[in-house]
Curated annotation (Swiss-Prot):
One of its GO terms (cellular component) is plasma membrane. It comes from the Eukaryota. Gene3D superfamilies: CRIB domain (3.90.810.10). InterPro entries: CRIB_dom, CRIB_dom_sf, SPEC. Residues 30-43 form the CRIB domain. This is CDC42 small effector protein 1. It comes from Mus musculus.
Length: 80
């Protein structure tokens, strides 16, 4: 009899939980940006391979010169 339970135990395994199907997002589900404030522009040539770290400080300084954006109330960038 114990041999029966031994064989039965070998066949019973815990089944993995089925993965939840992720909802696929398409373009119609994505709206326009909210609270977007354009602070600066970085061109493709400005962040070259050799000067990336040095340029980062310059970009941060340029953003600081635009004013303290954290103190400004955020608003929608679209005109109503």
């Amino acid at each position: 009899m114990s041999e029966f339970w031994h064989k039965l135990g070998c066949c019973v395994v815990e089944k993995p939980q089925p993965k939840k199907k992720r909802r696929r997002i398409d373009r119609t589900m994505i709206g326009e940006p909210m609270n977007f404030v354009h602070l600066t522009h970085i061109g493709s040539g400005e962040m070259g391979a050799g000067d990336g770290l040095a340029m980062t400080g310059a970009v941060q300084e340029q953003m600081r010169s635009k004013g303290n954006h954290r103190d400004r109330p955020w608003s929608n960038s679209r005109a109503l």
